[in-house]
């Protein structure tokens, strides 16, 4: 078994990539060549740090936070995610719903919008919360994603879940989360989505319980990179930027800027408060945020929306919403609204990732920042 452990996710990313390239077996499931190591356990010792800074790897942080909010709300709709990542529609069978959305599985187990099915839906996250509240030492705080009813071979779908099960343990005053996974693409799964998704769920649950965040463990039976498509170019770009051949060279030490950045914004909402916020957001605010009219007329409505968000009491939610407004404004070429939203975000990891994403579109705005030269080189992609 391969094991990796650390508190610096960027270095973990590089170390794991190096191991996959050096030691992975070449296979071709569905006719697509991969290099694979298995089984693998990754321990993220400080999962509040959910942003990575590998040069040569450009991650969409706007999508990461929007998808995490979408999961917490138990959503299954494709349309919401398309505003933050236009490629997500390829994983839906009908272009309307996903077959195996993590949020719907976790918060409305036994409901499937894609399959027009509902039978006594269960909020598994509330079940986990109640079990730990009743018995802090419990070993029964489990939430299941894989559902044979919809994920069997006879359901011809593009979307079967890679992540299967979540297991929470409260130990020594800290909440740990272990996620069990059948298949994990290193670039698009582990570090492109899962670290952000599941560390956010872990932080939410720890906040509801009033305990500290512990470790996040990702246990997978196939950790891989693609050799010809999907993430193949990402692997090539990373090796080129760092001047290494990971088949023969040692993994380099990589920069993560920890000492230059403010602490990441933290959640504060209780479970009931977050549920109320999510109901209000998706019931009222989301349609306003995604409406073209909001960003017209010199952006007056967008400015009003930003002013409301600025007074959001939960710092994590506030930063998430500011990033979402910035992406909506970016989609419509509203530079001033993008700048206003970004200026109200503290200089934390997710902001640096967002500035890097924005640089090609708005270099003149980004260059106004007076930041450490190492940060500015990363943001400008001077690699």
Curated annotation (Swiss-Prot):
It is an enzyme of class 2 (transferase). Keywords: Host-virus interaction, Inhibition of host innate immune response by virus, Methyltransferase, Restriction-modification system evasion by virus, Transferase, Viral immunoevasion. The active site is at residue 162. One of its GO terms (molecular function) is thymidylate synthase activity. One of its GO terms (biological process) is dTMP biosynthetic process. Its EC number is 2.1.2.-. It catalyses: dUMP + (6R)-5,10-methylene-5,6,7,8-tetrahydrofolate + H2O = 5-hydroxymethyl-dUMP + (6S)-5,6,7,8-tetrahydrofolate. Gene3D superfamilies: Thymidylate synthase/dCMP hydroxymethylase domain (3.30.572.10). Homodimer. Catalyzes formation of 5-hydroxymethyldeoxyuridylate (5HMdUMP) as a step in the pathway that replaces dTMP by thymidine hypermodifications in the viral genome. As a final result of the pathway of hypermodification, hydroxymethyluracil substitutes for a subset of thymidines in the viral DNA. These modifications probably prevent degradation of viral DNA by the host restriction-modification antiviral defense system. Belongs to the thymidylate synthase family. PANTHER family: THYMIDYLATE SYNTHASE 1 (PTHR11548:SF1). This is Deoxyuridylate hydroxymethyltransferase.
